[in-house]
Design a protein with these regions (language model features):
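Structured, active/binding-site neighborhoods that engage oxygen-rich ligands
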Residues: 1-200
Length: 200
C-alpha cells in the first residue's frame, strides 16, 4: 500500500489529471523516507482525510493504525483515525451522531468530542492539526441538518477548509446518502464516470 501512495505522490497515480497538489509536509516526508512520522509535531490531518474507506471493511483498530502510520504514526493521528472509522460504522448502523459522541471513549486529547454540542463556532478551530480537523468536521455535522449545510459550514470556518469539508462530507454522505448531495455538485465532479464505475 505504501508503494501505491508513493505512486500517487511522485507519479500522479489515481488523480484525475496525473498531478498531485497541496500535499502535507508530513505526508511528503513520510513517503520520501519510506515510513510514517511518529513525532508529536507530525500530527497533520493527512491520514484522517483518507481513512474513511476502512469503515466499510472488517479492518480492526490495529489495521486502522497501520494504514494511518504509512504517513502519520503518532498516537494522536492514529486515535483520530480510529475514532473516525468507529463513528462512521456506528452511523452506518443508524445510530445518531449526538448519542455516539456523548458515549465516546477517548483519550484526554479528544475529550471535547463528548461535548461538541455545547460549543459555538467561536470555540471551533479548523486548522490542519488532526485534533482540530476532527472536532471541526464533527461539529459541522452535528450542527447541520443537510449535506449542503454541513459542507458549506465546514468551508466557511476558514483555515484548512478542504480537508475539514472532506472529513465532514464523508460522514454526511453516510447520513444523507447520495440523494442528499445536490445534483449540480455531482455534475461538476471531474472524472465522475470513473468514480461511478468504482462505486456502482
Amino acid at each position: 500500500m505504501q508503494q501505491r501512495f508513493k505512486n500517487w505522490l511522485f507519479e500522479g497515480a489515481y488523480t484525475p489529471d496525473g498531478l498531485t497538489f497541496d500535499v502535507g509536509n508530513a505526508t511528503r516526508e513520510a513517503l520520501t523516507r519510506g515510513h510514517g512520522l511518529s513525532d508529536e509535531y507530525s500530527n497533520g490531518n493527512g491520514s484522517l482525510m483518507r481513512i474513511l474507506p476502512l469503515a466499510f471493511t472488517e479492518a480492526g483498530p490495529s489495521d486502522v493504525e497501520a494504514v494511518s502510520s504509512i504517513t502519520h504514526a503518532h498516537a494522536t493521528s492514529v486515535e483520530a483515525c480510529q475514532l473516525y472509522v468507529d463513528i462512521a460504522r456506528r452511523l452506518l448502523k443508524g445510530q445518531q451522531l449526538s448519542e455516539i459522541l456523548s458515549g465516546l471513549e477517548t483519550s484526554k486529547t479528544y475529550a471535547r468530542l463528548q461535548t461538541l454540542a455545547e460549543l459555538t463556532e467561536d470555540d471551533i478551530r479548523s486548522s490542519g492539526y488532526v485534533v482540530d480537523t476532527l472536532e471541526a468536521a464533527l461539529w459541522c455535522l452535528l450542527t447541520s441538518t443537510s449535506y449542503p449545510e454541513t459542507i458549506l459550514k465546514a468551508v466557511n470556518l476558514g483555515d484548512d477548509t478542504d480537508t475539514v469539508a472532506a472529513v465532514a462530507g464523508g460522514l454526511a454522505g453516510i447520513i444523507y446518502g447520495l440523494e442528499g448531495i445536490p445534483d449540480n455538485w455531482l455534475a461538476q465532479l471531474r472524472h465522475k464516470e470513473l468514480l461511478e464505475s468504482c462505486l456502482f
